[in-house]
């Protein structure tokens, strides 16, 4: 057996830690670039699930940004979203992310989204707080020279 490898993680400082219950919201209007790409032959133009998830994930990130040091950022590690209802072009969507818990540098969020009539999605999202320089180093090691 070879030598045992031990990873040394850069400490996560954070300005402050969000507490359970703290939340953030993002509102957006469903535009043409947000709709499903198969809205043809009688299929109505509605908000595509990948776009909905993008906005919901960014809502959790917005909740974290005030707590981060300039050397820190976040990366998503889990997305578990149930898309419950269609939302047509032009509707306003309100996304909400609420901190449920934290464990070290990992934060768990409850996510919800509502259009002008009803709840359209809910789920969970995990974010990790990372050191930007260390993360960039990991990416650089995977990048192939051109």
Where are these regions (language model features)?
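Hydrophobic beta-strand-centered segment that forms part of the acyl-chain substrate-binding groove
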Residues: 60-94
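A generic structural signal for short beta-strands and their flanking turns/coil linkers
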Residues: 22-26, 75-79, 89-95, 105-107, ...
């Amino acid at each position: 057996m070879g030598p045992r490898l031990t990873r040394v993680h850069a400490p996560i400082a954070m300005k402050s830690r969000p507490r359970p219950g703290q939340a953030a919201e993002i509102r957006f209007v469903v535009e043409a670039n947000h709709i499903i790409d198969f809205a043809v032959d009688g299929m109505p133009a509605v908000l595509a699930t990948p776009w909905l998830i993008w906005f919901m994930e960014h809502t959790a990130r917005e909740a974290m940004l005030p707590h981060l040091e300039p050397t820190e950022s976040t990366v998503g590690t889990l997305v578990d979203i149930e898309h419950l209802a269609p939302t047509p072009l032009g509707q306003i969507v309100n996304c909400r992310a609420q901190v449920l818990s934290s464990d070290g540098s990992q934060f768990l969020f409850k996510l919800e989204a509502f259009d002008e009539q009803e709840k359209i999605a809910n789920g969970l999202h995990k974010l990790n707080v990372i050191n930007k320089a260390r993360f960039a180093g990991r990416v650089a090691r995977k990048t192939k020279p051109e």
